[in-house]
């Protein structure tokens, strides 16, 4: 599977030949991809995005072509794009390949859970839009912000990141953007031995006993509000709930590493005090 995706990336990179002067209608697939285009000041070229594109507000007013991990071919084609910018986690691969075969320039950009991947992603996107100088400027700005945020004091805390999308909790382990952000903020992920996102039960939460719980805003909403979340089985008995250390975060801030990563670090460091 990894080899197939790698070969697809090479193929798409080789076949994406649209001139930057022709890039007027862009479809973005992936919340961070969309956010970067806007951070570069090029949001006016975006004609559609996907359901993970939650920031900035302007992105919410665009037509949606589905979810970036299960992109519908027809939805993208119907927007008549001259460029598709896709996270490397977008798919299915066959859809991206088909877009390229239809003559639609489809560029897959770096999207690993690290700030270095973020910097590569910015430069790749800026290059495709013909604004490499803006990409360099944005990267420098974010590097400085991240360095300043990391230098801020924090207290080591045993933390957990929870997501509720289907009524039950999933928790972030190693290899996720959430884990990387926790580490950058000087926090210890209680599930660092776990790979990826996995379900966590009320009993499991009680045993893990995190000092700090980070939960996404959408998950709090899905749980019926913050008070209802605090009272959920397994949550109420944790040290985090006892000491009122439950931090609600913007979904993209904690679940991805995008242009506002320094803001995420600042929020987590403040929550740890």
Annotate the PLM regions.
Residues 50, 172-197, 217, 247:
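His/Asp/Glu-enriched short active-site or ligand-binding loop at hydrolase and phosphoryl-transfer sites
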Residues 17-21:
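Sec/Tat signal peptide C-region and signal peptidase I cleavage site
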Residues 25-79, 83-89, 208, 226, ...:
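A short, structured surface patch at a secondary-structure boundary
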Residues 11, 15-16:
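N-terminal signal peptide c-region/cleavage motif recognized by signal peptidases
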Residues 94, 110-123, 160-177, 221-224:
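Extracytoplasmic ligand-binding site segments that recognize negatively charged/polar headgroups
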Residues 25-37, 133-187:
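Basic- and aromatic-lined ligand-binding clefts that recognize polyanionic substrates
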Residues 24-25, 117-127, 136, 217-273:
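Structured C-terminal subdomain patch of bacterial secreted/periplasmic proteins
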Residues 1-8:
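Bacterial N-terminal signal peptides that target proteins for export
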């Amino acid at each position: 599977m990894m080899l197939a995706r790698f070969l697809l990336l090479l193929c798409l990179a080789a076949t994406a030949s649209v001139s930057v002067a022709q890039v007027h209608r862009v479809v973005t697939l992936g919340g961070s991809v969309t956010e970067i285009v806007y951070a570069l000041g090029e949001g006016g070229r975006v004609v559609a995005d996907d359901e993970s594109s939650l920031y900035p507000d302007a992105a919410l007013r665009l037509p949606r072509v589905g979810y970036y991990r299960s992109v519908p071919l027809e939805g993208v084609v119907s927007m008549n794009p001259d460029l598709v910018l896709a996270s490397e986690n977008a798919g299915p691969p066959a859809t991206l390949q088909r877009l390229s075969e239809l003559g639609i320039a489809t560029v897959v950009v770096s999207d690993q859970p690290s700030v270095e991947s973020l910097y590569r992603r910015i430069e790749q996107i800026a290059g495709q839009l013909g604004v490499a100088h803006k990409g360099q400027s944005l990267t420098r700005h974010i590097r400085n912000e991240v360095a300043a945020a990391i230098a801020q004091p924090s207290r080591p805390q045993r933390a957990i990141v929870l997501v509720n999308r289907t009524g039950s909790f999933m928790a972030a382990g190693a290899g996720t953007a959430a884990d990387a952000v926790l580490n950058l903020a000087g926090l210890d992920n209680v599930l660092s031995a776990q790979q990826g996102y996995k379900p966590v039960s009320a009993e499991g939460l009680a045993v893990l006993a995190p000092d700090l719980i980070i939960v996404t805003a959408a998950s709090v909403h899905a749980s019926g509000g913050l008070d209802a979340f605090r009272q959920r089985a397994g949550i109420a008995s944790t040290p985090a709930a006892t000491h009122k250390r439950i931090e609600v975060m913007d979904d993209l801030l904690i679940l991805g590493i995008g242009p506002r990563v320094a803001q995420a670090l600042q929020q987590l460091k403040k929550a740890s005090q």
